[in-house]
């Protein structure tokens, strides 16, 4: 039985060898024939081949003094750029140095000008205060007073959430509003007590108080809250001054929305007992689900306070609906023809909605005064706020009790995260809406300084409020200076209205809290958008809410933070590396989009891949183009062309020039290209691989495995393992198992070999070991256009990959790199011998080097717009580094 010889590879004829009878050929003979095959192949590799020539310049093969053949590709049409003798000017590319990095990225920040710029950035008010005018003042005054009217009742309500007396909420409000004006980069954010931070403060007070079972008189709730503000302020300011605000970006928006929704749900149910009048019967510091259960159990214990809670809550929602939705809709419907009246009613609705909290509290405070005046605490039918000290009490340097800071340590990370994330998320959101830039580092400084100054007034932690910031933006505030007017309103209330605050019903404050906090609950549209944008974000959001509700707010915060970091690491550790194929694409401008979806195949196409419309004649103003649809029907279409005059008085024809684009093979899934387009594989012996993330120690092993598996799958060995002695084969790749001679002579083995069923059940190999038609790997092109950085571990993995592939291919495989965007990545690659041929890893006699350079053309000026200067785009000393993926189909491989 005769057997055919080796496959025809690179037009090399391999002598056939015959096998007679059924005996196994001698290994020495096979090795001799294989050596002859390799010699013929190598000799043919260095022979110059005839190259075709056409209107576009083709390759010019040049044999170097070392015997390495280089081929040069002309990427420009000769009508555009003329390259003499297909040559490029020499350009020696150097590697980046530490001095260059210092000059480029560091030097400018260490100068006197840089120091002045830094100091100026700490006080943004310096940039806009000289331009302050009366129009800005009027807008800021109106917005500031409006926010002040909202801030007073809200700050007292949130102090109740924090289990603190009402005056501490007022202290935090006025000092936060004052100090933020001088450090802010957002004109809309309002600093003060907020719901989530107040809840966290209450948790901290409860935890720290539990650590003092004997009841130290110096460790009170206000002292713990002020100490927490001190520590949060120091850390926030330090992070801002050191410009480490990017750390806040590690937690994603969906994670922030998750724990804010869970916290809002916690606050809402925590205020229901006070709303109904049985607050002392329910432990509102327990897990949320327990609070819900206990609240429902004690519904029969409802008191008269429910009247002062449920009615205000109902009125607040009706008020919001009428003034925010239905009233403006009626105004637009019936007053659109009277612009002046329409504007008056519009602003009336707006300010009525903004003042709803204050008006409700004033009304029910009057009722509370009427029914509780002159009665003792036990005789009062409802719970009222009680005594609120007038003015600023105990102003001065705050002294921290010994040992208190260490007790706060375990609660500090969660508190800082709540303090920073909510504020940064709010400020950046309004910055996008109102078209101004928010500097996160400076915002951290503003929060830190505000809380540090607050310790002189016994304030508790304050940060940005979403509801007040939204109201401030709707008031058309112009500068952060409006905070001065808001703070003045709070200060005025502290000195003039504390007597009236005594009669505020606690149930009414709970109604205000529930009404304000309900806006923090994520709507079903937000939840559904998370699912549509990314299911993983949806899962993070839901799980964070559940953990916050069924465990604690701290656990929800830590889970959200860990989830965000885990997703970041997993995306880097498991990159979506892709092997690429090629397709010819072209840009068609001002094209007519046909309503049908048939695929068009142009019949008239020249040799350069340029499709043109067929000219119907010199006098004919219409030219016809034939195309073929996917239903195999020829359709003739008349395309009207614009009659631009040309020197030959002929109609200019549209030209579509195609170029090679490299696309992943799984483009049907990635939607990078029309799924009906067939991706052509690279030429034989070429693999193109795109890395989708930075090439680091986290993912280098995965890339190594993906590439080696693909190499072994689509290419054959340089030295077939069947033609090697068994003793020379590696233990981890010994080849197919063959039965020993004594086993083949046994009767049952012969019967097994002749049994059709056993042949069907025998393991099959994807490649015929007798005849392997797969090509030899010659070029591995790595697309580094998305690789921002690399490290020593990854570079060593790349060296190991080169060694393994060279050993598999039995030759030096060329490693080409495309689109390197970092000079440090290029420096690392060069240090490990990449960028050109490396004779250290293989015998030069089996290397066929291919050189390809990109050139760039630059117009010489307006005087000679048709003349260009041509430069070499990449270093000629590094021929394996490219700006774009070469068109390997044009290479002489």
Swiss-Prot record:
GO terms for molecular function: secondary active sulfate transmembrane transporter activity; sulfate transmembrane transporter activity. Residues 676-854 form the STAS domain. It is found in: Membrane. One of its GO terms (cellular component) is plasma membrane. It is a multi-pass membrane protein. One of its GO terms (biological process) is sulfate transmembrane transport. The keyword Membrane applies. It comes from the Eukaryota. Disulfide bonds: none annotated. InterPro entries: S04_transporter_CS, SLC26A/SulP_dom, SLC26A/SulP_fam, STAS_dom, STAS_dom_sf. This is Sulfate permease 2.
